[in-house]
Structure formats: structure tokens, C-alpha cells
Amino acid sequence: MARRPGVAHMKVVVLAGPESSGKSWLAAELHAHFGGLMVGEYVRYFIDHHQRDTCLADIPDIALGQLAWEDAARATQPRLLILDTHLLTNKLWSQTLFGDYPAWLDDELLARHYDLHLLLSPEDVEWTADGQRCQPELADRRAFFQGSLDWMQQHHQPVVVIRGDWAARRSQAFAAVEQLLVAPSHA
């Protein structure tokens, strides 16, 4: 299908990384600054709705809920789609908490195009409890970060690692998204 001149191609940005690294905050900051559409984290809705911790049997429902939210947002074709998370987080949490994950998560992840992953480091910011978080130890969050980075590199996903204090994270993320938005589309 030929692209009409002057019509921007949707760019999809994913915030990834361990808990308490600023993903939701940064997604909201990006949305406020650049506009577009932001998709939240389905697992938070799931836990709030069911009022209990998750188990391995919940992972397919959580992943399908996340996909439904993402796909509904994609269907609207915003100039910029900001995802607070995606299936990689569901996969890694399932592995971390339950030692297993539904194999179809890999296929679904690789079937979708993501223009940029902003991978947030656990370094330089404090872990904050919020009733759903469970990795207060920096070593655990570092392992989650490394698992995310390893997957992205293995699957040749575009990634920018975001580090530093909150102001530095915001500045780095804004610069990466700005660069993405001015780059020519190749899709």
C-alpha cells in the first residue's frame, strides 16, 4: 500500500525494565509532552479487579488483556503509541515468579513491530513499594533488567537504555523519542 505524502506513520514506543524504575511515570511524561496514545499496564488492572496476587494460570489472561489493549490502541493509528509495558514484561515476570511462561508469548511479541524500546535501568533511583511490587533487592531488579536487555539484543529490537536520576531519565527518553519522530519511516 502506498503511503500518502505528508501522512505520518505510527511510531510505537515501549517502556521496559524492572519494577520501580519509572516506566509508568515516564510513559505519562512522554504522553504529556508528545501526545499520541498511551496504553497502561493490564496486570495492574487485573490485580485491582481480582483483589489477589497472580498465579501461573493467570498469565494467559493477563497477556491477552495486555494484547487487547495494545491492539485496540494500534487500530486507532495514532502518530505515537506509548506502551507502559508489553508481553516481554509478562514473560519475564512469569519466569521469575513461577519458573515458566506460556510459549506463545514469544510468537506474539515477535509478530508485532516496535519502533523503540526504552529500557529503564534499576540503578540510580530508589525502589518504592506500592502494594504490588515484590523486588526490593537491587540484585533482583538488575537480573530483570539484564533479562530484558538480553531478549532485545537476541531479537534485534531497537533499544535505548535509560539511566540516571528522574530528570536524566526524562531527558534521555525525550531525546530518544524526538529522534524517532523525526526519523523517516521504514515500515
Feature locations, PLM:
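C-terminal accessory "lid"/substrate-recognition subdomains
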Residues: 4-7, 160, 168, 174-187
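Hydrophobic anchor at the beta1->P-loop junction of P-loop NTPases
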Residues: 15
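Conserved substrate/cofactor phosphate-moiety recognition/catalytic segment
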Residues: 28-71
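Glycine-rich phosphate-binding loop used to anchor ATP phosphates in small-molecule kinases
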Residues: 61-112, 127
